[in-house]
Amino acid sequence: TVDWSKGEIEREDLLAFYHPATLKKLEALRSWIADRAPLGADCVDPVADWIRMVAINRLSGHSPGFFSGRSMPPNQAVSVKAQLKINEKLGVSPPERDVAGIILKKTKTLLKDGCVPAQVRSSLHTAPAWDLPNIADSSVDLVVTSPPFLDIVQYASDNWLRCWFAGIEPESVAI
């Protein structure tokens, strides 16, 4: 289990998004996940990996179902400066959130039809579409993608908060 008392605020600027107690819990959770499901490891704790996925989905948003105070919709991670402006405009400070409760509630929603079927196999590859040596020819039935909005969307800066939680330096990700 996560020792919630172990969380130390490493980035004070994130207090624009989170109540201090919430941010400490997020830091404790980040550490717990990093110990059990390190990125790039061959063998990770699938429960910790699941919790990371759910937590990243709940980092910021515009309702009490997110860890942050009121922000933009979750697909629009704003900068610290923009979040401070939102807080000032609304006259609010981020409220304390129940990190474990939010993760549990979202997990129940995601698994409302039961567990993920064991036969479902998926893989994530980051490489040019024309060069995927780890995928056998004629073995793919469906590819789901989003069109690149390279002139509109700034993927690294738009995902900075998710990268922080996952322990990824946005500049290190090739886009």
Predicted regions and their residues:
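Intrinsic disorder/low-structure terminal segments
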Residues: 3, 16-17, 65-66, 148, ...
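SAM-dependent nucleic-acid methyltransferase catalytic core
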Residues: 21-145, 150-153
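Conserved phosphoryl-transfer catalytic core
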Residues: 1-37, 168-174
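SAM-dependent methyltransferase catalytic-core segment centered on the flexible catalytic loop
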Residues: 1, 132-133, 140-143, 148-175
